[in-house]
């Protein structure tokens, strides 16, 4: 028997590297400190997708700190995405080929890296909205990620 103040780990699938479904997405557990990476949406039929700041899994809340490479690759239905405020990393090719994606809102002020070709093939009139205190830094961070010059980054 496990004391009340400790979590039982026997038979638990909540191990680092395991994938879990929550809401409209699939998440991979990335750390023992209750962090996950958003892997991909459960289906690619949605026109709007919100990558949340946190998700509820079987043993509690987990912070969503990254978006996996190719998460929305070639998703032609997607028009709008919101990225939660705990995300620090956006993987390579995340929105690659999402040609109808016209609006990306980044709520996170913690973003440190954006992978190669993350924005390749998004709509040429896409607007990327970022926190106003991070406008200059994020313009640099999002530079040359495959998007057309007509893609706007605003606050």
Stretches with model-predicted labels:
Residues 1-18:
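Ser/Thr/Gly/Pro-rich low-complexity, disordered linker/stalk segments of secreted
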Residues 69-71, 91-94, 116-118:
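Consensus positions within tandem repeat domains that build extended binding/scaffold surfaces
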């Amino acid at each position: 028997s496990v004391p009340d103040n400790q979590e039982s780990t026997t038979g638990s699938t909540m191990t680092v590297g395991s994938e879990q479904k929550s809401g409209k997405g699939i998440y991979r557990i990335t750390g023992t400190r209750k962090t996950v990476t958003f892997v991909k949406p459960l289906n690619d039929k949605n026109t709007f997708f919100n990558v949340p700041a946190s998700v509820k899994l079987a043993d509690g809340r987990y912070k969503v700190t990254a978006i996996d490479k190719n998460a929305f690759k070639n998703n032609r239905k997607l028009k709008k995405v919101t990225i939660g405020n705990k995300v620090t990393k956006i993987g390579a090719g995340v929105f690659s080929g999402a040609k109808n994606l016209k609006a990306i809102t980044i709520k996170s002020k913690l973003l440190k890296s954006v992978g190669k070709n993350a924005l390749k093939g998004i709509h040429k009139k896409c607007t990327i909205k970022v926190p106003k205190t991070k406008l200059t830094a994020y313009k640099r961070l999002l530079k040359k990620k495959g998007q057309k010059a007509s893609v706007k980054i605003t606050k």
